[in-house]
Amino acid sequence: MGMKKNRPRRGSLAFSPRKRAKKLVPKIRSWPADKKVGLQAFPVYKAGTTHALLIENNPKSPNSSQEVFTPVTVLETPDVTVAGIRLYEKTTKGLKALTEVWAEQLDSDLGRKLTLAKKEEKKTVDALDAVLEKATEVRAIVHTNPKTTGIPKKKPEVVEIRIGGSSVAERLAYAKEILGKTLAISDVFEAGEIIDTLAITKGKGFQGSVKRWGIKVQFGKHQRKGVGRHTGSIGPWRPRRVMWTVPLPGQMGFHQRTEYNKRILKLGSEGAEITPKGGFLNYGAVKNGYVVVKGTVQGPAKRLVVLRGSVRAAEDKFGLPEIAYISTESKQGN
């Protein structure tokens, strides 16, 4: 009997079951332990990708002090509106909402997404002070303003964002200041900062085992029978069922994914200076502020992406590299 070759399983079971995400707005399950007072995330819209030439600032790199071709992602950052404040207390079963307060003047388009309370039913800010002793977390309820972008919709997305700070009282004081106001990306992040991106990936529909799991394509008689791309064995006789670990066809893409430690290369307020000739594919022109992120960001154009402060950032040894050039040439292929 010959020696068995090392053959790791195809694909990863870490993200099973690979099914469609319930909503287009990603869930934020963890937050950075940051004592800086302010929002710890910001929702944006993906415009597209381009490329930049960065000056390599790693002195030990073979390309040190030279221009390096780098793919970058452009995200449009329309201002968000702080519509409400919510307080949580810590219990043995997790966080429990104590109370919430909404701004007096709310955007009429928010009614497309939520059932807004009547004016006489709204709680005042005093309701927050009454439960301050129990509270352990303060979060802001913000909504986007897609009508100011080129995205053809008016219904906003609503995101709950944690407010950082050294104490609950300090966080609540900041929350009261921003209630009902609009915030820009520059109020939350700055150029050179390390962030995480959360979004729903591009959907691929129903795909076979080879594309979905990366199993081996069979040749010989399997190809002649027209079954070269199927799973060779889906399990033993017993147990008399198919295990969940078997690579089978099914949904691929449209999953929530988090990518860690991306660097913000540039923040800007004039979208015209970053829009390529003819606009971004499937998006158009950037009409508001923008942020340029090094590398790729998950999801198609127009997809909502949440930028969050990094939860596992490594030591930043070299800092923000100098940008020599950002391409604004046409992406239309001509």
Curated annotation (Swiss-Prot):
Keywords: Ribonucleoprotein, Ribosomal protein, RNA-binding, rRNA-binding
Any Gene Ontology CC annotation: cytosolic large ribosomal subunit
InterPro entries in alphabetical order: L3_arc_euk, Ribosomal_L3_dom_3_arc_sf, Ribosomal_uL3, Ribosomal_uL3_arc, Ribosomal_uL3_CS, Transl_B-barrel_sf
Pfam families recorded: Ribosomal_L3
GO molecular function terms noted in the UniProt entry: rRNA binding; structural constituent of ribosome
Region called Disordered, residue ranges: 1-21
TM helices/strands, residue ranges: none
Composition-biased stretches (Basic residues): 1-10
A GO BP annotation: translation
Family: Belongs to the universal ribosomal protein uL3 family.
Subunit details: Part of the 50S ribosomal subunit. Forms a cluster with proteins L14 and L24e.
Known function: One of the primary rRNA binding proteins, it binds directly near the 3'-end of the 23S rRNA, where it nucleates assembly of the 50S subunit.
UniProt protein name: Large ribosomal subunit protein uL3
Organism: Methanococcus maripaludis (strain DSM 14266 / JCM 13030 / NBRC 101832 / S2 / LL)
Gene name in the database record: rpl3
